[in-house]
Swiss-Prot record:
This is Chaperone protein DnaK. Acts as a chaperone. The lineage of its organism: Bacteria, Bacillati, Actinomycetota, Actinomycetes, Micrococcales. Residues 496-515, 583-624 are annotated as: Disordered. Pfam families: HSP70.
Amino acid sequence: MSRAVGIDLGTTNSVVSVLEGGEPTVIANAEGFRTTPSVVAFTKDGEVLVGETAKRQAVTNVDRTLSSVKRHMGTDWKTQEIDGKKYTAQEISARILQKLKRDAEQYLGDTVTDAVITVPAYFNDAERQATKEAGEIAGLNVLRIINEPTAAALAYGLDKGKEDELILVFDLGGGTFDVSLLEVGKDDDFSTIQVRATAGDNRLGGDDWDQRIVEWLIKRFKESTGVDASTDKIAKQRLKEAAEQAKKELSSSMSTSIQLPYLSLTENGPANLDETLTRAQFEQMTSDLLDRTKKPFKDVIKEAGIEVSDIAHVVLVGGSTRMPAVSELVKQETGGQEPNKGVNPDEVVAVGAALQAGVLKGERKDVLLIDVTPLSLGIETKGGIMTKLIERNTAIPTKRSETFTTADDNQPSVAIQVFQGEREFTRDNKPLGTFELTGIAPAPRGIPQVEVTFDIDANGIVHVSAKDKGTGKEQSMTITGGSSLPKDDIERMVREAEEHAAEDKKRRESAETRNQAEQLVYSIEKLIKDNEEKLPEDIKNEVQGDVDALKAALAGEDDEAVKTAYDKLNESQQKLGQAIYSAAQAAEAPAAAAGEEASAPSSSTGEEDVIDAEVVEDEEKKQQ
């Protein structure tokens, strides 16, 4: 029988774990280490090296050695040409997964086909899909994509007591950062782990701390020798490796010596680097990176609606949390609570993934995992407005439907444009994809009903469908790849959503005013046309003049001019109603009755604020 494993596919290191007798075991690789560097190298004789062997030869093969590829997942990034081929992030990640798969098979003496792979909680849809594709390229059946902090809580939470508890997971890896708050509910023989809130930064990790040391060393080397090492690829690789080692040493020592003989050549001969870096210097040069971890932490506490004192356990995940400044900051932010030191920050995520694999394969039946979607999902409606159907931190899997309408008369189709993010306007959010629902029956604007349904599966991958209720025609798509879309920083979306809240509100109000103005122009022109014979020429000309003025304002960029013209037309349109009513009073009773029917839509049109793409039906289904 084939086995299922749990894999932590990390930016700098990866780990594989398996359940044996219901208990997780971390599998050592062929080189004897429990973590495998996420490094892939192509040698000049055509061999592909992965892990420790690839990392060791990086200095002599800089251009053909690839690391930190996880930062490119879900983008259109490709390697430079290697032996006539350019590789995607998925293909390079697949090489790492293949290595982990082989090591697991060698350890188990059995084939491995199924895997649960972890991703940062703040990975968007394209990044998750790319991770799943990498697994498939590696020959794995990806049972589930789960969030790294959730996996850590799963591994940590099940060993604790029987009471319900809140666990905060602070996950600072090599390239990504997440904070998650999870609730562990227990009874005698069953545990439920539910994610309450999550936040993070997909462009913050240990690599950034290493880079600060590299920059400092380049500067010091130039000051002492006059040589700019940043232009030498081999020198930069040596500096990068030295910086990583120095960072690790400063976690247990107050200072470290960095010595790189023959780093470069000058007119006077070889130039050596010999520097001493203290922990205080290191913490000073990286203080702004540490500060960037504070906001996601505060966001999670606020989002979950709890006090810091409600947190029962703090779990540190990721090798970067070994830095004393990081654990000290976590202690300060949690009101002096000591972070738990009982878990291995490098291995706990893979252990949780193995547990989840066991649950999905039926080997463990005592736990239920409930995850959340990290960002809001919605579609673009008229004016470029982001209409959210699923809010961030909604439990998944989930399904949500809303009904929209058309913006123009006899509109034959609607384009469903799907976005992910927190801003009020779609242009500030990440596009996930577009599809078109065609064959809508001809009808005036506002009459057709198009039901849009968002369905997020347990992997956090989005499926969207649209159905014309009139004709029954339906179109759907699964958001895949995202490789052709520009890559936006997800944390930036949430941060800017708060920073630009006032600006967004003003822009949204402007868009809504323009929508209302267009609707008013449409309805007044229709009213004039339908009642042309009943309206006195002077009133008709006056109102038509106001209509033309509003149309001219709409053609320009001045929002105040639109509002002024809108208010004037809104006022003058009442004269139309009075004129039609007077004509009706003067006519005979049957005519009067007909006149009242004609006047009914006029008052409705004049007083209602109708917004295109208005939601007319709301139906929510959530699957737990």
